[in-house]
């Protein structure tokens, strides 16, 4: 049986600067990382004893599997906690938008951020329009359903 302990919000708020500092220190060793965000439970204040650290990175070029694992291993060692590392180069518009909305910037590059923001919001808006059309069609019974 696993028990989930939610830490008091005050402890999380006090710990966030230390967490951000450690993440920044580790990621500065990887000059190909142009943007990085802390997101998920640590950014949202819902950390439990079992929570991993969710970090999203944007590199100049899509990092290889080995490179991502190297970065993730360095973060795990430095954070002394499991890290879920997301490559924003290959992430869905939905995940990228969640990172933009709820994430905390750890590594910032203003021009790269602006390009990432414009691309992500554009793709997300396109996806919402397509999804809305599909949902309306399904409700009318138009996709695989009986037509009224």
Map each language-model feature to its residues:
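Catalytic core of pol beta-like nucleotidyltransferases
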Residues: 1-35, 43-45, 60-148
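Short edge beta-strands and adjacent turn/loop segments
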Residues: 39-51
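Short beta-strand->loop micro-motif that forms the acidic, two-metal-ion catalytic signature
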Residues: 54-57
